[in-house]
């Protein structure tokens, strides 16, 4: 699978400096939801994306190249409280420039925490994507923390109902256990037309 050939390409704080891509998959989510860990597990790697227990570690747009001009993009987490209002505004601008203003073919994967559940910020992000007609999916990470309380089917159904999306748009994974990634890997491989 081509995803295991993914390499770090560049980091930038300005989306306008990104070269044009053929297609890209963009990961967004609340701070400390495990975006970097999801990317590592998705690509069969341990340290491709830097992880940290400190929320707000990712403060730049991190781009990973799979094959020529087909990218995974990790955006800064939203909702981290310990930054200034000005820095939050810069992050918001960075996210808008990357997702809306760039004209590359794209799909956004919104990562939510199964244990915490979707937050107001997650709903705001999904509403914003819908308003801008940006295709998106939901990844429910940290499922290992709740499977002794609820079933995967219950998580899937509740997520679909809350976000008003189709069943194929929900992916339940555990980056920590590296489980549940097969369906997500196939979805991304198909979207990016990887071989």
Language-model features: where?
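Conserved G1/Walker A P-loop phosphate-binding module
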Residues: 1-82
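Canonical P-loop GTPase G-domain recognition
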Residues: 2-16, 145-195
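Generic structural signal for conserved hydrophobic packing positions in ordered secondary structure
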Residues: 8, 31, 64, 91, ...
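Structured catalytic cores of enzymes that bind and process phosphorylated ligands/cofactors
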Residues: 32-33, 39, 62, 107, ...
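Conserved nucleotide-sensing/catalytic segment adjacent to the nucleotide-binding pocket
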Residues: 68-105
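Conserved C-terminal guanine-recognition region of P-loop GTPase G domains, centered on the G4
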Residues: 96-168
